[in-house]
């Protein structure tokens, strides 16, 4: 299968199974589109009919182009066969290790964001803070179930984890004290709204955290529409200076300033540009996922605007890189030469199998977006996973699990998509969140184009 599209002056041909990317002229673009359904003679006739007025488009040139396409096909770089389906099933069945935990150290928050999927940090339950004892047991559980894997990921999440920062510090200290003995290397991520970041916190995060995720929706009026405290006051004026201090002192370590866009700001590229103009260079912006009846939910009529926004963003990134003002966008970080292995491309994030979320009480869920939904509770950190039926559902989530995905050119980029988004949109982790699919495919098209432009 190949996917062909035109963007920013490039004629792009993407081979689905091999991942090969080709940029071609108009004639070759049309020949590739005809190649599988027409004989060489038919292709020559149709191409001459369309391009025969051009001096360099002759029968011999067309036949030579067909030969080149055939050579690429034989080399597995065009119309290549997908031989990966069995790998998906075998890998998930054989993989029994846990590589990462999302520790919900705070089921409470100091912001009252109305679009929050976690019900202002409560996850449809009670407010709570994780104790050191539960967190310590979670780290031990991760080590016990990680097999021979050395690098382990731990995300400090909420709610707002800064409301339980002393426990965060003690857990990091504990992990560092045992990682040598256990032959493990912990990499910590910390997600914060930035409201109560102190210099002491920043110093600790910069020392210990491999990555920090900083929540900001962009322009002040956009951010302060949803991201408000319990008195209704916007957060922008508080968090932007805090984030600047953190990033400026981070010394090149990883971070993301991450926002959410809604129906209210479908011109979200302006929010990304605003964040870049503030001096932030590692950026992400996610579409809101919420019930379709919500006033801020994205609607079908928004799609053409959103597609255009992603294209505008890619072009702006090319422009700024040439000007010496580059920034990165998470969804455009596509490595065409040294990307993830085929197993990762097939199986995705590993939620429910290699990755789990831990509540303040030690309950296990497939990921943070399932926390509070009792039917998706997997077990707990004290007794382990006992809901193997649900875990097996997640083992089957891959690029080939859904019939709709089998004929999709983007399946080896999305790995079957986000199980949580599918569940919230369709009621099943085996469903297809079609709106999200359309956005994802547009992002991949832009990301590939961006790679082509930057490698010219």
Task: Walk through the language-model features, giving the residues of each.
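Radical SAM enzyme [4Fe-4S]-AdoMet core and its adjacent flexible, acidic
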Residues: 225-237, 244, 248-352, 377
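C-terminal accessory region of radical SAM enzymes
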Residues: 304-338, 368-415
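Short Fe-S-cluster ligation motifs
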Residues: 139-157, 394-396, 431-456
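Cysteine-cluster motifs in flexible loop/terminal segments that predominantly coordinate metals
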Residues: 395-446
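Conserved alpha-helical substructure of the radical SAM core
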Residues: 56-72, 76-203, 207-208
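Short acidic, hydrophobic short linear motifs in intrinsically disordered regions
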Residues: 38-52
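Radical SAM/AdoMet-radical enzyme domain recognition
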Residues: 135, 139-155, 164-288
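Acidic, low-complexity/disordered tracts enriched in E/D and polar residues
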Residues: 1-35
